[in-house]
Amino acid sequence: MRYLTITLTLLLALTISLGNRSQAAAGEIQDKLSAESTIETVLKRGVLRVGMSTFVPWAMKDKTGQLIGFEIDVATRLAEDMGVEVEFVPTKWAGIIPALLTGKFDVIIGGMGILPSRNLKVNFSQPYDYTGMSMVAHKELAKGFSTLEDFNKPGVTIAARLGGTPVEAAKKHLPNAQLRLFDDESQTIQELLNGRVHAVVASAPMPAFQALKYPEKLFVPLPENFTREPIGFALRKGDVDTLNFFNNWIGFVEAEGWLKERKHYWFKTKDWEDQLQ
């Protein structure tokens, strides 16, 4: 009986010891995860670093050189709600995901489409916007063109921004056309205005804005967008705390109507156009 009591006592002590060790290990893991969380890092730093690339009307420079646009408003509001400053890190689109993964900034807020190929490299928040691919074309070179089939020919040249979803859309829907890639969309529009390409594939509503800006040279050949894609924040994998916060924040600003109001201002009106350079 005495041996049984001793044995049970030892087993109980061992169980308590193992339990304490497990709790300590769990605590260490939690502390490590918390310490590595982008949210915790941003709060300690006091600055949210946002990777982005300029394209109308998501992000662009006004007459004073300051960044304005839908994504600029979104990132600024996000930082304000976190109680920190925002720092924008302009980055070429083709290298923006590698820059995120190497810690150049904390999050990509730049109209990034949620694609399976991208999701293998980064995590995405829930969508906070939806967009689609459209085209703006040269009036003389693309005279009479009104369908994708008109542009899907070997003699047609299409321009798109390097590294963006327009490239994937052009390859999928216009496989027979010649595709020229550029670092940013301003270059694609300049090539179009110079008559060196038939059309530019880009996210709506940029093509419509360019056609309104240069009505003597450009037009929108398609009656509606030919793709639809969700837009989300991109962040590094494995950071559940940051992903949770971003998702809840998006839900909050959607519920209060702020996102809808900002979308209307930047995508449905031209009240901001006189701010541009």
Task: State what each model feature region is.
Residues 27-111, 120:
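Extracytoplasmic small-molecule ligand-binding "clamshell" domains
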Residues 36, 72, 88-98, 143, ...:
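Short helix-initiation/N-cap motifs at beta->coil->alpha
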Residues 76, 80, 85-150, 218-219, ...:
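Acidic, polar ligand-binding/catalytic clefts
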Residues 130-137, 204, 208-250, 268-277:
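Periplasmic-binding protein-like
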Residues 25-36, 73-81, 139-142, 149, ...:
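Extended ligand-binding regions for polar small-molecule ligands
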Residues 95-98, 111-120, 169-172, 193-227:
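A ligand-binding cleft/hinge motif common to bilobed small-molecule-binding domains
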Residues 49-57, 67-80, 134-184, 199, ...:
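Bilobed "Venus flytrap"/periplasmic-binding protein-like clamshell domains
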